[in-house]
Design a protein with these regions (language model features):
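Positively charged n-region of N-terminal signal peptides that target proteins for export
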Residues: 1-4
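Bacterial N-terminal signal peptides
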Residues: 6-15
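Sec/Tat signal peptide C-region and signal peptidase I cleavage site
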Residues: 16-20
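Non-catalytic cap/lid and distal C-terminal segments of serine-dependent acyl enzymes
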Residues: 21-284
Length: 284
């Protein structure tokens, strides 16, 4: 009888082992915080690497921005970020890092400050301080990076240009680099969409680089830049205009034009380049 009990306990321990180990595996959590600036609750997803189970360790952080019509769950549900990050870390191609995916609204809100939506203020005055005081993050420029796709690529670029003291690197995928003011924007019957379009005009990354002073240029150049856009992307020309401005100002950058369009398949593959790239910045 004693042998049977011993065998049963050993078998139970063997069966339960994967569940016990699951607590130390990489996790992707969905959380929330209250914003006084926006006057609402904002949700976010956060990837915690395997090493986060060691309470004595701290980690670099990547803020990963979604695109238009999506939310904080897009990189989790469509971008396969957890599996790709874990694969790259396990293969030694990327550092262990915390990846934070904020919510910039579902449609036509975005990452800029505009009437009734001070998202840029929220991001830097509330969101980053909340994240970096809640989780074990190394809170300095060298260990902080930003990346994003489409609208989030534009937000990535704008934030890295105007808050260069915050980020060691910026990786813009299929980015909306800016819009030129046109009568069709002011005639748009959708007021919410019109506000978003007007904010994209006011926060034009191309113009920001073109008009940069020598002091501003030096700050922008303190960020390691990577522009990634597909040869079939409708924003290809928009990205080439940004590259032209960077070249004129002699700001170093890396450019990758790959086969593909404005698709999740493209952005999933971009992560295989983005995470090693920001990891190199963390190590500098």
């Amino acid at each position: 009888m004693k042998r049977c009990v011993t065998f049963f306990l050993l078998l139970l321990a063997f069966v339960m082992q994967p569940f016990a180990q699951g607590n130390t595996c990489p996790q992707l959590l969905e959380c929330e915080m209250q914003s006084e600036i926006l006057g609402c609750t904002k949700r976010y997803c956060i990837y915690l690497p395997q090493g986060y189970s060691d309470e004595n360790r701290t980690f670099p952080v990547l803020y990963l921005l979604h695109g238009l019509t999506d939310t904080h769950t897009a990189w989790r549900d469509k971008g396969d970020v957890q599996d790709i990050a874990t694969e790259l870390i396990n293969d030694g191609k990327a550092q262990e890092m915390i990846i934070v995916m904020p919510d910039a609204g579902t449609t036509y809100d975005g990452y800029f400050n505009c009437d009734g939506w001070r998202y840029e203020d929220f991001f830097f005055q509330e969101f980053i301080p909340h994240i970096e005081s809640t989780y074990r993050i190394i809170p300095d420029k060298q260990h902080r990076a930003i990346a994003g796709l489409s609208m989030g690529g534009g937000g990535t670029t704008w934030y890295a240009i105007n808050h260069s003291e915050m980020f060691s690197s910026a990786y813009a995928m299929s980015a909306l680099m800016g819009l030129v003011n046109d009568s069709w924007i002011t005639r748009d019957p959708d007021a919410r969409r019109r506000v978003f379009m007007e904010s994209a005009v006011a926060n034009n990354n191309i113009t920001a680089v073109e008009n940069a002073t020598q002091e501003q240029r030096a700050k922008i150049a303190s960020v390691r830049w990577f522009i990634d856009v597909g040869d079939d992307d409708f924003l290809f020309d928009n990205n080439m205009e940004f590259i032209k401005a960077m070249r004129q100002k002699r700001i170093p950058y890396q450019l990758r034009v790959r086969e593909g369009g404005h698709t999740w398949q493209y952005w999933q593959q971009a992560l295989y380049i983005a995470l090693p790239f920001v990891s190199e910045s963390f190590g500098e």
